[in-house]
């Protein structure tokens, strides 16, 4: 369904609020899929309007009645049309995304920044860190670098590594490191832990690929713009997660902690490893497939974890 600006739209849409309402209506009517930074049509329309008009994200409500020039309407409606007809995620249309209160560059080199781990970062990882003295932290499967850079931003005394197998993702992460002056973040190319020999951490955080093959094949069109490498994770979504569980103890201090997102693969992980004491994080909006687990717990159950990982 096209939403190109018609003469009627040019005549009847006058203000910022008019355009936001129009965009939200078109997005809802088109049955778009949300979840790439924003979870509803109104927020997506708002971000596209503000981006097209070069306005700040915290624009006061008084500006909502500001009238637009004809050329400004054209810019806004062109973005609306791409969102509807091409199903391009908003973050890829605007070129940026918010994560943990920070604005990151976003493009198809890496997944759009989104993870409930942002809430943990802004809460200082409490109560999970429980007073641990973190000096070195790792963001494994860093993608755009959003988790690593946010950890470094809110914990300037930490030394943070961001590791990823994708050179494309690391190039984007480097741009975000420069953009956000993340001087305490180092980016490393690594296939899981292979490029991190000799490095040890008090905290490892990971948002790895965890979407099953069947789910990946059935994802809405919006997800097709993202690199499949960051999504697909085998028949049950745990191919990479099990390797992380197996190898993390070699890179954690004895009292170290692993925090990992597995999304809807949570139930399968618990079914495979019922003996492991995973602490599932409760977020403000409920439980969302993120666990914390102690290094000693992974060591105690290394054999069954390693056996499962070897099957992948």
UniProtKB/Swiss-Prot annotation:
UniProt keyword annotations, A-Z: Methyltransferase, S-adenosyl-L-methionine, Transferase
Gene Ontology cellular-component terms listed: cytosol
Pfam family, one: MTS
GO biological process: methylation
GO terms assigned for molecular function: nucleic acid binding; protein-glutamine N-methyltransferase activity
Enzyme class, spelled out: transferase
Alphabetical list of SUPFAM superfamilies matching this protein: S-adenosyl-L-methionine-dependent methyltransferases
Domain of life, source organism: Bacteria
Keyword S-adenosyl-L-methionine applies: yes
Catalyzed reactions per annotation: L-glutaminyl-[ribosomal protein uL3] + S-adenosyl-L-methionine = N(5)-methyl-L-glutaminyl-[ribosomal protein uL3] + S-adenosyl-L-homocysteine + H(+)
EC number(s) recorded for this UniProt protein: 2.1.1.298
Similarity-based family: Belongs to the protein N5-glutamine methyltransferase family. PrmB subfamily.
Record's function text: Methylates large ribosomal subunit protein uL3 on a specific glutamine residue.
NCBIfam families in UniProt: hemK_fam, L3_gln_methyl
Listed name of the protein: Ribosomal protein uL3 glutamine methyltransferase
